[in-house]
């Protein structure tokens, strides 16, 4: 086997460059508040995304899948393996296979390094585009006006970037080919990708007066491309399976969140009589009742769902949360503890239980559970922020500062991370072992900071732990 000499694109846009730029864009998207911070939705997307990635034989890429609160039908791949899916697209899918098909396509854009290859193919124009994109990101991160922030987000989500970077027709076909192979290997219907393309194409054909779905403008879909996708799917065994419960749970939660008011969500789920609804529709109804403060009605549904199926974590979480809202802490804790015994170290469950424990005045137990989860399961930024919140409520101020620093690092804010660590070093009750740990962390972070970031750090103001109450 010949040694890997690398790609010509690496000379202009290396994998490290992609990772760094991806982190910057993600920092801006998170700052906009558009990332859906729902642990059940996030875990689901990463679960099926990981199944697809496992079929690509690309161990060199780290992937993060996340949902973006946006009714437009679109998905996008960012440098560094960040895959974003609009809530509008998830709602538009008719099956889990279609959603998996979209994710497989976006994963292929990353594994085939299409952005880097496009930069190499047209380096002058693409580097200018990259410079413009980074300028928008920096402006947004620096607190520029809303137009600048929205412009940065639009670029990051692909409405501008994918047009400016200009994925070629060859790249789109390659993403389809590689994606369909991964789709089939992961156990999904290989026709899922073509099926979603057809839905988008049909929507535009039957309603030409409507604006084309964002997905079709950033990922042009032609009749020939649909036919090619279907032809490639024939090379793989036909897989027919029901949608997973997790797919239905995620869609139901996003549907409830999409309404302007909880009352509208309740109206939506009450259109059909309860006895005619399936379990997912009943779950959506319970979530809507919960959001609307109709806790007794929600509790009745969760009890009904758990009597039929105890294997769905979301049902346990919903019941526990509702019992807390009904001021029944003993029953709530018993519900969560029983669920923990069934599903140890499940991230959405531990997060939901820990939030309720803090609310019920037991932050020490919450802190213990969250640290155990952190040591065994890769965390999300919001999960680390919750550790800081639990530590603060438990009187562990130094640890609260430390984990707020880690949260800032996870969202790409190195300056903010050092800021929190430096404040922790000023605490009079700081233990020597903590001082050594915090100083070592600061030294480690500095190695990754630019001269400009180091200057910004010198002029930054202390932020304290007030943000934990937001």
Identify the meaning behind each predicted range.
Residues 97, 107-124, 142:
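Catalytic Zn2+-binding segment of zinc metalloproteases
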Residues 84-101, 163-170:
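Short pre-active-site segment immediately N-terminal to the catalytic Zn-binding motif
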Residues 284, 318, 352-353, 386-387, ...:
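Canonical tetratricopeptide repeat
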Residues 5-12, 23, 35, 43, ...:
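Extracytoplasmic and endomembrane cell-envelope/extracellular-matrix remodeling and assembly machinery
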Residues 85, 101-109, 113, 175:
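Active-site recognition of the HExxH zinc-binding catalytic motif
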Residues 67-81:
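Catalytic zinc-binding patch centered on the HExxH motif and its immediate surroundings
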Residues 127-142, 151-160:
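Membrane-active amphipathic alpha-helices enriched in small hydrophobic residues
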